[in-house]
Amino acid sequence: MGLISGKVCVFIFVFALVAEFSFGNVEVNDDKHFFHKPRPFLHKPRPFLHKHGIYKKGFGKGLGGGGGLGGGGGLGGGGGLGGGGGLGGGGGLGGGGGLGGGSGLGGGGGLGGGSGLGGGGGLGGGGGGGLGGGGGLGGGAGGGYGGGAGGGLGGGGGIGGGGGFGGGGGGGFGGGAGGGFGKGIGGGGGLGGGYVGGGHH
């Protein structure tokens, strides 16, 4: 009986020892394999999310310019309050100018001129217009309140209007024929004005 008990104890000891070295190592390896494995698919860089073209570049740049308050510019220009300019000019309140000019309240000018309230002409004329509008180099029609045909170099209009270099019909509130350098009918306009004597021939 004691011999059988001793053999059983030895068998249990050997079995436990073998199980420790075999199944114990498998459990450790499985633990490392399944639970401590690095996850490269979770830590990959995402080039489609971090492209410079998406996050680093703005959307309001380039050809055609911006806008907003005091805004943009560029080719074709912006607008807004006090806005743009550039080639083709802007507009808005007090707005742009540039090549081809703009308009607006107190607006543009530039090459090709503009209009608006108090607006001007520019090089090569364009319609004056608005309240006290004007001509520019090469003239253009004055207009607005008290206007009249602008004309010539620095032509005019406005209340009581006038001519300019190269003359043109004055105008204005009660005004007469405007004069200027090289015109026959001299004189100015003004409030209650009239025809005044000849100018330089």
Curated annotation (Swiss-Prot):
Segments forming a coiled coil: none
Highest taxon in the source lineage: Eukaryota
Region spans: 21 X 6 AA approximate tandem repeats of G-L-G-G-G-G, Gly-rich: 62-194
GO biological process, one term: response to abscisic acid
Signal peptide start and end residues: 1-24
Keywords carried by this UniProt record: Repeat, Signal
Induction entry: Slightly induced by 16-hydroxypalmitic acid (HPA), a major component of cutin that triggers H(2)O(2) production. Accumulates in response to abscisic acid (ABA) and salicylic acid (SA) treatments.
Each Sequence repeat, start to end: 62-67, 68-73, 74-79, 80-85, 86-91, 92-97, 98-103, 104-109, 110-115, 116-121, 122-129, 130-135, 136-143, 144-151, 152-157, 158-163, 164-169, 170-175, 176-182, 184-189, 190-194
Record carries keyword Repeat: yes
Keyword Thylakoid attached: no
Protein name, as recorded: Glycine-rich protein 23
Origin species: Arabidopsis thaliana (Mouse-ear cress)
Lineage, broadest ranks: Eukaryota, Viridiplantae, Streptophyta, Embryophyta, Tracheophyta
